Curated annotation (Swiss-Prot):
The gene is HAB2. It comes from the Eukaryota. CDD domains: PP2Cc. Interacts with PYL13. PROSITE patterns: PPM_1, PPM_2. Mn(2+) 2 binds at residues 242, 432, 492. This is Protein phosphatase 2C 7. GO terms for molecular function: metal ion binding; protein serine/threonine phosphatase activity. Belongs to the PP2C family. PANTHER family: PROTEIN PHOSPHATASE. Key component and repressor of the abscisic acid (ABA) signaling pathway that regulates numerous ABA responses, such as stomatal closure, seed germination and inhibition of vegetative growth.
Length: 511
């Protein structure tokens, strides 16, 4: 008895990485078969068309192989199946992970496989959605391709893997503005900011989903064949500001840093449009964030005109606060391809990649070797008084504000430019009210477990509702971390942002 592949359902984005909108795409679903001899299959470059009444589907040329190793039937609403055990690993990685040559439909798209399919005679062997080419602004349309099997043919369906081969891309074909990286990175976050053991609240947090379109050249560099029209990626902004000596500077950072950052990115956009700067991406982002922080610091100190909050055109030349007030500032820009973190002070950003924590910032402490040397070179002193302090007063070596400690305490941030990876789980931004009592690994493990536990208890939100407002699972994780910090002895204000980097999760279930 002849054996063939099982019924499968696939949602495919079928277009080149960059497509000329004037050139139509013809895509084929090729050779769904058992991968018992992968080498023979991958070397087989022939074209076939089955038209004998058994299988009727389009076959085509091959060049690039994409293997889906654990194919499952997709329900029309793409609901998330929640695992029974928190320690189980996800079967399917999130929709934000990008693969060269693949365009992924926005999770909020209404395109999906049909619930039922009518065939003239037989049963469905495979169905797939073929996306028609669109511009970024248009809603993708689709056609459903169906391969069916006649009842009168005696065949046995067996489990197998599926190899989907994409047509060879012609590098000489003109390309349009649609990019493989123009993929909606669904923002999933939760925040909390509490007084903790302090009598006054001096912290502030800010989350701005869909913050800004960033030119791909600032993320991916000058790839051959990239459109000169500078396609963009959507970024999401997150910031934690830990004030000291008062709340004025932290509050001003809350209201101003994101807009100052947007101004600097806009300036870089204009430079990229006029010419190729020749700078590396790390250098570009360092310049963007340093200029942003220095501008805000000058505004805080009354050195330059600053905008008045709530007024679009009014400017004033006056200090925001007394010169003894300052704030840390840790900021993360998250998009589908990269995470960019800037930090000034002792707040911190930590990434959970797989099961390992990765700090994306390094605390600016006076006893850090390079910071100690910089302070002494500038004529300052690091004095031990309940820990290392600049001039015996400030327990951090960099901050925004603190004019009375210039030039020993500086506002210059350090910047980390981190490409996203498939294993990325979550990102935590927090003030030292958390990090003083909890290690990076502990915080990441607690956050991940809490997110998974929330999904186990409550199920998954419909995709159309994900990314709208704060994510309840991330919110639960942030609140849980703050309670643990208090239980572990934190006496400071505690501000936390938890960002779930798995925009779409699918978990193992107990059979």
């Amino acid at each position: 008895m002849e054996e063939i592949s099982p019924a499968v359902a696939l949602t495919l984005g079928l277009a080149n990485t960059m497509c000329d909108s004037g050139i139509s795409s013809t895509f084929d679903i090729s050779e769904l078969e058992n991968v018992t001899d992968a080498a023979d299959m991958l070397c087989n470059q022939k074209r076939q068309r089955y038209s004998n009444g058994v299988v009727d589907c389009i076959m085509g040329s091959v060049s690039e192989e994409k293997t889906l190793s654990e194919v499952r039937s997709l329900s029309s609403d793409f609901s998330v199946t929640v695992q029974e055990s928190e320690e189980d690993e996800p079967l399917v990685s999130d929709a934000t992970i990008i693969s060269e040559g693949l365009i992924v439909v926005d999770a909020r798209s209404e395109i999906s496989l049909p619930d039922t399919v009518e065939t003239d005679n037989g049963r469905v062997l495979a169905t797939a959605i073929i996306l028609n080419e669109t511009t970024i602004e248009q809603v993708p349309t689709a056609e459903v391709l169906i391969a069916s099997l006649n009842h009168d043919v005696n065949m046995e369906v067996a489990t197998s893997e599926v190899v989907i081969r994409l047509p060879e891309e012609n590098p000489n074909v003109a390309r349009g503005s649609r990019s493989v990286y123009e993929l909606e990175c669904i923002p999933l976050w939760g925040t909390i900011s509490i007084c903790g053991g302090r009598s006054e609240m001096e912290d502030a947090v800010r989350a701005l989903p869909h913050f800004l379109k960033i030119p791909i050249k600032m993320l991916m560099g000058d790839h051959e064949g990239m459109s000169p029209s500078l396609p963009y990626l959507t970024s999401h902004f997150f910031g934690v500001y830990d004030g000291h000596g008062g709340a004025q500077v932290a509050d001003y950072c809350h209201d101003r840093i994101h807009s100052a950052l947007a101004e600097e990115i806009e300036r870089i956009k204009e430079e990229l449009c006029r010419r190729n700067t020749g700078e590396g991406r790390q250098v570009q982002w360092e310049k963007v964030f340093v200029d942003c922080y220095l501008k805000v610091d000058d505004e805080v100190k009354g050195k330059i005109n600053r905008p008045v909050v709530g007024s679009s055109d009014r400017m004033v030349l006056e200090a925001v606060s007394p010169e003894t007030v300052g704030s840390t500032a840790v900021v993360a820009l998250v998009c589908s391809s990269h995470i960019i973190v800037s930090n000034c002070g002792d707040s911190r950003a930590v990434l959970l990649r797989g099961k390992d924590s990765m700090p994306l910032s390094v605390d600016h402490k006076p006893d850090r070797e390079d910071e100690y040397a910089r302070i002494e070179k500038a004529g300052g002193k690091v004095i031990q008084w309940q820990g290392a302090r600049v001039s015996g007063v400030l327990a951090m070596s960099r901050s925004i504000g603190d004019q009375y400690l210039e030039p020993f305490v500086i506002p210059d941030p350090e910047v980390t430019f981190m490409p996203r990876a498939r294993e990325d789980e979550c990102l935590i931004l927090a003030s030292d009210g958390l990090w003083d009592v909890m290690s990076n690994q502990e915080a990441c493990d607690f956050a991940r477990r809490r997110i998974l536990a929330w999904h186990k208890k409550n199920g998954a939100l419909p995709l159309a509702e994900r990314g709208v407002g704060e994510d309840q699972a991330c919110q639960a994780a942030a609140e849980y971390l703050s309670k643990l910090a208090i239980q572990m002895g934190s006496k400071d204000n505690i501000s936390i942002i938890v960002i779930d980097l798995k925009a779409q999760r699918k978990f193992k279930t107990r059979s």
